[in-house]
A protein has these predicted regions:
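The alpha-helix within a helix-turn-helix
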Residues: 28
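N-terminal acidic leader/helix
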Residues: 1-25
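Short, charge-rich amphipathic interface segments used for partner binding and complex assembly
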Residues: 32-61
Length: 64
């Protein structure tokens, strides 16, 4: 079971990505996780996956 609270989930997912997996998709497949559920929870808290950095991070809003 993975954490459902956004900040705990963020920490958990980023730790797994850093320590074990080359991509978010690989992690979800290997751990039998629903990627859409994770994306929805983290997006709702303002986080997005950066494939280049292989981690979730805060979305940056552009100032006009």
């Amino acid at each position: 079971m993975i954490p459902k609270e956004p900040e705990m989930l963020l920490s958990y997912v980023n730790m797994k990505l850093r320590d074990r997996y080359a991509s978010f998709e690989e992690m979800c497949e290997d751990m039998d996780l629903d990627p859409e559920e994770i994306r929805t929870i983290l997006a709702g808290a303002g986080y997005r996956y950066d494939g280049t950095a292989n981690r979730y991070q805060a979305e940056i809003e552009t100032v006009r």
